[in-house]
């Protein structure tokens, strides 16, 4: 029987909040249960802390738990706890106003030193109102620890701007939250649906969550019901890593990620200091199918004192590490009004920095300890890691060590060569790391620009991923060595360059008039025309200057629908090649023009993989062959 009943209006902020809740402030409805179980966990934590100095508050019942039940006929779900409970004044303050769930005031009252150990969560206390996402009426029955049974409180609201509060009798300490579900939310009146949600969100809180289960006699006949713990209530990451087996880590990864394959590696760390947190990070073995989809969700699971707050907390990991899986569990993270969107602040930034460093250390260790495993990882996630130099300047050198490339040192197209490997094999006097970018490994491997390097035995990295050119615009040096494209017209081999011979000087002089004829013929279509002594088997190539956009970068711009600046090539001719010698001797201007055009088109085709007018090219070949 209720007494001393009164009806009150919600604080104006609460009215706004309820409207947001009812219209799905949260991204999915089922988290109402997570929030209410989280509140029950709060209540248990508060009781544990206060009972340290006043054990009588346990009232002979120190086995704290939360119980979830439902009544399909009445259309209700009840979440009950035997935690700290609330007085009438606390109910009015905490359920009638926003940002006063009690946790923040509780911490202030205790003082910061004690609060460090209190394991309390939340700053805003809006989780309770999430009940109105699925309920058109909410009833709360609560009695504060240490109060008489007739000092309990009844609170009810339909979420429409006001609530009622009255005195009732309640024998047991704690709080019962009864949700009267909307007609279209009856899917939650199902034991297995509730078990699924509890397993998903509350498996690893440090409080048993119980549901009623049927009991059967020896003959298999139903003989009653009993409360059964349905969550693990054992946060694996809070245990010492020395007490967790590899199999447990692997099983937890699969539980966490819903992956069927064992992870490649993992790291479990507990950090204390200005920020106290625990992280458990995993490197998956296989890339998800939508890894490069912009809508792909990624990030870590966020827990606050073992209470699951959100999936895909991307604030803690840079985009180029979006393949990392795992969790972070912290007690002092600030949360916004919905507890699903982290505030952008110094704590978040510091955690991101630390977790990024930890992830890169994991990959460094894997590469060092098990090269074969690392190469398997690279095949799955290498393209993503190549985004790193552009995104993370502070860790650029570390990321660069993790990159792998195909190379002229090896026969196959597999990307197995690190920049450190390359430097160890550099020629005496070599000052740069040389590379070439192309549309494919085959195109890079057979580029005429490689001829001189093959002749001198200088290793060249063969880059054919679309992202490579963009990556190299940010990764310009490593370990004090410049990364240099061999397709540049102003390529400088330094001490490795051949000294100009007397023969070359004579050739330059003899072909002077020929070069002028070609310049006059091509005019503004090329930047310049010159002889080159860097080719062995090819008559001509085109190249760009260092200050010009490369061919591959221009292709990236075009593929992205961006305007592409005009690229004017330097046309380089090999005076040792019989075709160039033949063309130089042609007197007829028409025939001369056809042959020069053919040499230019061949060079352009080798460089770009396509021509603006392939029909004219074919026609010219047929004409000269006829």
UniProtKB/Swiss-Prot annotation:
Major location category of this protein: cytoplasm
Gene3D superfamilies for this protein: 3.30.230.80, 3.40.50.11260, Heat shock protein 90, C-terminal domain, Histidine kinase-like ATPase, C-terminal domain
InterPro entries, per database record: HATPase_C_sf, Heat_shock_protein_90_CS, HSP90_C, Hsp90_fam, Hsp90_N, Ribosomal_Su5_D2-typ_SF
Positions of region (B): 340-555
GO molecular function list: ATP binding; ATP hydrolysis activity; ATP-dependent protein folding chaperone; unfolded protein binding
Residue ranges of the region described as C: 556-626
PROSITE patterns: HSP90
Cellular compartment(s): Cytoplasm
Positions of disulphide bridges: none
Pfam families hit by this protein: HATPase_c_3, HSP90
UniProt keyword annotations, A-Z: ATP-binding, Chaperone, Cytoplasm, Nucleotide-binding, Stress response
Region (A): 1-339
Gene Ontology, cellular component aspect: cytoplasm
Keyword flag Cell membrane: no
Family designation: Belongs to the heat shock protein 90 family.
Known role: Molecular chaperone. Has ATPase activity.
Subunit structure: Homodimer.
Name of the protein this chain belongs to: Chaperone protein HtpG
Protein source organism: Haemophilus influenzae (strain 86-028NP)
């Amino acid at each position: 029987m209720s007494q001393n009943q009164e009806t009150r209006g919600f604080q104006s902020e609460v009215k706004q909040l309820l409207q947001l809740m009812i219209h799905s402030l949260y991204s999915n409805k089922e988290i109402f249960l997570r929030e209410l179980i989280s509140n029950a966990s709060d209540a248990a934590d508060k009781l544990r802390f206060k009972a340290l100095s006043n054990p009588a508050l346990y009232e002979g019942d120190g086995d704290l738990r939360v119980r979830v039940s439902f009544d399909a006929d009445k259309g209700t779900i009840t979440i009950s706890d035997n935690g700290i409970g609330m007085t009438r004044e606390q109910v009015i303050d905490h359920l009638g106003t926003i940002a006063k769930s009690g946790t923040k005031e509780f911490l202030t009252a205790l003082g910061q030193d004690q609060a460090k150990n209190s394991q309390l969560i939340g700053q805003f206390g809006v989780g309770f109102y999430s009940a109105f996402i699925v309920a058109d009426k909410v009833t709360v029955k609560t009695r504060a620890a240490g109060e008489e049974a007739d000092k309990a409180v009844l609170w009810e609201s339909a979420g429409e701007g006001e609530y009622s509060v009255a005195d009732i009798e309640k024998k047991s300490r704690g709080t019962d939250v009864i949700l009267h579900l909307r007609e279209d939310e009856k899917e939650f009146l199902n034991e297995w649906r509730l078990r699924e949600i509890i397993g998903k969100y509350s498996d690893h809180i440090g409080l048993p969550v119980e549901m009623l289960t049927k009991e059967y006699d020896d003959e298999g006949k139903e003989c009653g019901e009993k409360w059964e713990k349905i969550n693990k209530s054992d946060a694996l990451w809070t245990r010492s890593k020395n007490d967790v087996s590899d199999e447990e880590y692997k099983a937890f990864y699969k539980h966490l990620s819903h992956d069927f394959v064992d992870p490649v590696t993992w790291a479990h760390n507990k950090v204390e200091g200005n920020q106290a947190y625990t992280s458990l990070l995993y490197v998956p073995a296989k890339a998800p199918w939508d890894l490069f989809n912009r809508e792909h969700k990624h990030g870590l699971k966020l827990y606050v004192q073992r209470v699951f707050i959100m999936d895909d907390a991307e604030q803690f990991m840079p985009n180029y590490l979006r393949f990392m899986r795992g969790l972070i569990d912290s007690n002092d993270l600030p949360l916004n009004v919905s507890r699903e969107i982290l505030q952008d602040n110094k704590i978040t930034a510091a955690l991101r920095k630390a977790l990024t460093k930890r992830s890169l250390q994991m990959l460094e260790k894997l590469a060092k300890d098990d090269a074969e495993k690392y190469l398997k990882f690279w095949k799955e996630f290498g393209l993503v890691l190549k985004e790193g130099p552009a995104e993370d300047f502070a860790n650029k050198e570390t990321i660069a060590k993790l990159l792998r490339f195909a190379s002229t040192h090896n026969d196959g197209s597999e990307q197995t060569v690190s920049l450190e490997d390359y430097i160890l094999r550099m020629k005496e006097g070599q000052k740069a790391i040389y590379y070439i970018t192309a549309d494919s490994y085959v195109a890079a491997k057979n580029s005429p620009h490689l001829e001189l390097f093959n002749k001198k035995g200088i290793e060249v990295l063969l880059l054919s991923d679309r992202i490579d050119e963009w990556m190299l615009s940010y990764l310009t040096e490593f370990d004090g060595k410049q990364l240099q494209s061999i397709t540049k017209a102003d390529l400088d081999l330094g001490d490795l360059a051949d000294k100009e011979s007397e023969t070359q000087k004579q050739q330059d002089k003899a072909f002077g008039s020929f070069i002028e004829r070609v310049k006059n013929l091509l005019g503004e279509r090329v930047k310049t025309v010159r002889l080159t002594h860097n080719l062995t088997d090819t008559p001509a190539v085109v190249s760009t200057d260092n200050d010009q956009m490369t061919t591959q970068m221009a292709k990236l711009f075009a593929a992205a629908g961006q305007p592409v600046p005009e690229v004017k090539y330097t046309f380089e001719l090999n005076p040792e090649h019989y075709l160039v010698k033949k063309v130089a001797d042609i007197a007829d201007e028409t025939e001369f023009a056809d042959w020069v055009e053919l040499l230019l088109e061949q060079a352009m085709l080798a460089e770009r993989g396509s021509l603006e007018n392939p029909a004219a090219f074919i026609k010219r070949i047929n004409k000269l062959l006829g």
